[in-house]
Amino acid sequence: MIKTLFIILLCGILSACQPVDIQDVDIAAPAPKRTVLKVGTLYGPQIYLNSEQGESGFDFEMAQRFADYLAVPLEMIPYTNRKQLFAALKENKIDIIAAGIAKTPNRSQQFKLGPTLYKVNQVLVYKEGTPEPKDISTLSGEITVMANSSSVNTLTKLQKDYPELMWNQVNDKDNEELFALIANGELNYTISDSNSLLINQRFLPELRAGMILEEKVEVVWLLPPNNSDRLMSKLLAFWHKERRAGTLEHLNEKYFGHVKRFDYVDTRAFIRAIDNILPEYRSFFEEYSGELDWRKLAAASYQESHWNPSARSPTGVRGMMMLTQPTAAYVGVDDRLDAEQSIRGGAFYLKDMMERLPDTISEAQRIWFALASYNIGLGHVEDARRLTESMGMDPSAWRDVKKVLPLLQQSKYYKQTRYGYARGSEAVHYVDSIRRYYDTLVWIDNQTKTMEIIEEKEQVEVIAEEVPAKSHVSAQ
């Protein structure tokens, strides 16, 4: 069921990961003054999503900050058609495009480009289990990309060195549909930016990254080519302010930092477990999570025990949440092998860790510090925070503390701390893994709900069609 769900809905939810070039559109009249900031975007987990938990995405968060900087409300306007998105900017229907757009010569000619958000590599994508390509010149005719995309720009550059290089262009499929076709073995190769591939691997683990075809491609916002000097000036001032504040680094860590480590076997196993094991315990996670998103608690439990109530480690921790005897006693768990008790106790302990953290840590980041504390202890995390501050970094930012945690394994650093040696790199891996599990679980959970809505709507339509027919038969 999950596999089918991926292929059917991957396009709709993640359609924004691969930007495309646009065709020339006539310039419209100057834009009137606006009382809101209208930002055109595309749907995608790293760009813009609007779910039960509210709006999210790298571009959304930056756009919200920019609107706050301008002291105007933000209006995000999602487009499903890229051509319409670019035309809307040319026609002054929107003020900015913030949609994970790659910088290309064509876009530089047609738009004003904002400062660089981040950089990506253009990589060859192929299927797990097939031979990894070593020479781009041997793949002529086997690469399929979207027409007018930045992938075409990459291939055109390569063609100068490999004149025989040819590729297939499709107009009726987007990048995520191409990913699904690669995963199913229906296509051999495509090209993607590295971040989009890493994000999609959480849902389609069969995707593999091959050779890097173009390095450090800039991702930018787009502004109208004319009558946007004032907005560009404000954007540049805002950008410098946010860079100094570490906002770009924080958002890069939030949306991309945890997806850079990919494990094919583990991802496939987790997807199967969501379908086969989680339903038995989901109600416990929902009941005891409280204000915490139940999927974060479930992700932590999978990292601990792979949802095995009888799990045991060599150090003596046991159960779904792998509690020690002292911790079990502290949270009121009598039987660590009882799944419900273990989940209840683990949830209580995790929330207790969150409450004991300093108030300087933001609500959004407290969970990551709490999970690290769950893994190696609150004392060691506080040691890492103090070291972080002594190095001139932010002790309340997970992006900085995760850099310092591995230093607790080096005597040069841990001898300066109160609690001494700790496996800090293990804690970083622990938190990153939970974040990946959580992202995958959220995606699958949202798609399941979408499918249920679609099926319910179809059933209503079928019933509506049948009722008149039955009434007509009765009248006879």
Curated annotation (Swiss-Prot):
Gene3D superfamilies, per this entry?
Answer: 1.10.530.10, Periplasmic binding protein-like II
Q: Which family does it belong to?
A: In the N-terminal section; belongs to the bacterial solute-binding protein 3 family. In the C-terminal section; belongs to the transglycosylase Slt family.
Q: Which InterPro entries match?
A: Lysozyme-like_dom_sf, MltF, Solute-binding_3/MltF_N, Transglycosylase_SLT_dom_1
Q: Which region is the signal sequence? A: 1-16
Question: What is this protein's gene name?
Answer: mltF
Task: Name the species this protein comes from.
Answer: Shewanella frigidimarina (strain NCIMB 400)
**Main EC class of this protein?**
lyase
Where found, per UniProt? Cell outer membrane
Q: Does the keyword Transport apply?
A: no
Assigned EC number: 4.2.2.n1
Q: What is its main location?
A: membrane
- Tell me what reaction this enzyme catalyses: Exolytic cleavage of the (1->4)-beta-glycosidic linkage between N-acetylmuramic acid (MurNAc) and N-acetylglucosamine (GlcNAc) residues in peptidoglycan, from either the reducing or the non-reducing ends of the peptidoglycan chains, with concomitant formation of a 1,6-anhydrobond in the MurNAc residue
GO MF, any single term: peptidoglycan lytic transglycosylase activity
- What protein name is recorded for this chain? Membrane-bound lytic murein transglycosylase F
Give the UniProt record's GO annotations in the biological process aspect.
Answer: cell wall macromolecule catabolic process; cell wall organization; peptidoglycan catabolic process
Active-site positions, per UniProt?
Answer: E304
A Gene Ontology cellular-component term: cell outer membrane
Membrane-protein topology: Peripheral membrane protein
Q: What is known of its domains?
A: The N-terminal domain does not have lytic activity and probably modulates enzymatic activity. The C-terminal domain is the catalytic active domain.
> Entry's NCBIfam families?
PRK10859.1 (NF008112)
